[in-house]
Swiss-Prot record:
This is Histidine--tRNA ligase. The lineage of its organism: Bacteria, Bacillati, Bacillota, Bacilli, Lactobacillales. One of its GO terms (biological process) is histidyl-tRNA aminoacylation. The keyword Aminoacyl-tRNA synthetase applies. PANTHER family: HISTIDINE--TRNA LIGASE, MITOCHONDRIAL-RELATED (PTHR43707:SF1), HISTIDYL-TRNA SYNTHETASE (PTHR43707).
Length: 426
């Protein structure tokens, strides 16, 4: 058997991982500006953590979860999304306690797992950036969180991203709308896809989210949930819209957007762009004011989003955005002869200890091959170290671009390499 990575996974090699690290670092710095701290939860959870919170009838639970019974016969699942594990952690670690400053703001970066058909920007193991804010019902929290994602896209230079906005209202609003949707869809039940016929019985709002052609046709003239918002829900949504306007964040109202998870209420949103003439959601989230209570915690408002890293990098690539990740070395040491091996190690280590990026030859190659490596690594300077240099205690350091050289002692290299670099950069 040829050993290969499982279908729907990827190896992120050093040339690409630098781009991932750059995007992750920009995200971390953006989130810090909004007073978010990092949280890390397990990659696997008890099955009920996901099934009960995400919803037993969702595609995630019924079709896409990686779940198994471990050796202790515990029902375990690899996490398919980030919010439920974070809420579980919030409750388990009593972050709702009065001594913990509110709102509690956390972000996470990690792998998620769903058994889906692999395609561009959608893998079975995918990576997600996410944020969760606990303890604020203020619509300003909704807008601040959306603005944080908007700022991240702007910082990365991403263009042509549209904010889609909707409200699911509170429980009373959703119940009224649910019945209106059932009344509308029931006469055309037979024209719906098999999945949506099931959804009509279990969770009719999910029909609005279907990607099947026949379902899209069926819901074209469906009633709008915005017509069923009560006064509280309407006020919340109006304030969100007014604040987005005040921050000059453009948006479109998308009344058919319901999100694929059961725990949302009030504001929901997606950032959508077009790739190869197809719509691609790169960030999505919303408000969930009952989820903490559902996990056994006190009544606690919540708001957050998830953002797919693979999709974000795909958009950056398709839009031709060059990330500033070109790697280079400060110095490359070419080593001539076994007699210079030990001294080369001492030199390269001392330069690294001074805070510089350094590499040396380990393979005993010809000098031409070593110089080629220096060029490949984009080394700013090159030191050639042979047995004669070891004996004299003096080496030549060459600027790899201008070919200018300076002669320096080992002592100067090992104690003050910064000065040597400055000499060559004049």
């Amino acid at each position: 058997m040829k050993l290969q990575k499982p279908k729907g996974t990827q190896d992120i090699l050093p040339g690409d991982s630098a781009k991932w690290q750059y995007v992750e670092n920009v995200a971390r710095e953006t989130f810090k500006k909004y007073n978010y701290g990092e949280i890390r939860t397990p990659m696997f959870e008890h099955y009920e953590v996901i099934s009960r919170s995400v919803g037993d009838t969702t595609d995630i639970v019924t079709k896409e979860m990686y779940d198994f019974h471990d050796k202790g016969d515990r029902h375990i699942t690899l996490r398919p999304e980030g919010t439920a594990p974070v809420v579980r952690s919030y409750v388990e670690n009593k972050l709702f306690a009065p001594e913990v400053q509110k709102p509690v703001k956390v972000y996470y970066i990690g792998s998620m797992f769903r058994y889906e058909r692999p395609q561009a920007g959608r893998l079975r193991e995918f990576h997600q950036l996410g944020v969760e804010c606990f303890g604020s019902k203020n619509p300003a929290t909704d807008v601040e969180t959306i603005a944080m994602a908007y700022q991240l896209f702007n910082t990365l230079g991403i263009k042509d991203v549209t904010l889609h906005l909707n409200s699911l209202g509170n429980t009373d609003s959703r119940l009224a709308y649910r019945q209106a949707l059932i009344d509308y869809l029931t006469p055309m039940r037979e024209s719906l896809s098999k999945d949506s016929q099931r959804r009509l019985e279990e969770n009719p709002l999910r029909v609005l989210d279907s990607k099947e052609k026949e379902d899209k046709v069926a819901v074209e003239n469906a009633p709008s949930i915005l017509d069923y918002l009560d006064e509280e829900s309407q006020t919340h949504f109006d304030e969100v819209r007014a604040m987005l306007d005040s921050l000059n964040i453009p948006y479109v109202i998308d009344t058919n957007m319901v999100r694929g998870l059961d725990y949302y209420n009030h504001t929901i949103f997606e950032f959508i762009t077009n790739i190869d003439k197809s719509e691609l959601t790169i960030c999505a989230g919303g408000r969930y004011d009952s989820l903490v209570e559902y996990f056994g915690g006190p009544e606690t408002a919540g708001f957050g989003f998830g953002l797919g890293l693979e999709r974000l990098l795909l958009v950056l690539d398709k839009q031709g955005i060059k990330l500033p990740v070109e790697e280079s070395l400060d110095v490359y040491i070419a080593v001539l002869g076994s007699g210079a091996n030990g001294k080369a190690l001492e030199l390269v280590q001392s330069i690294r200890y001074q805070g510089f990026k350094a590499e040396r030859d380990y393979l005993g190659r010809k000098i031409k091959a070593q110089f080629k490596s220096a060029d490949t690594f984009k080394a700013k300077t090159v030191i050639t170290l042979g047995e004669s240099e070891v004996e004299s205690g003096v080496v030549k350091v060459k600027n790899n671009a201008t070919r200018e050289e300076v002669t320096v002692s080992f002592e100067e290299l090992t104690t003050n390499f910064a000065t040597v670099l400055k000499q060559l950069e004049k």
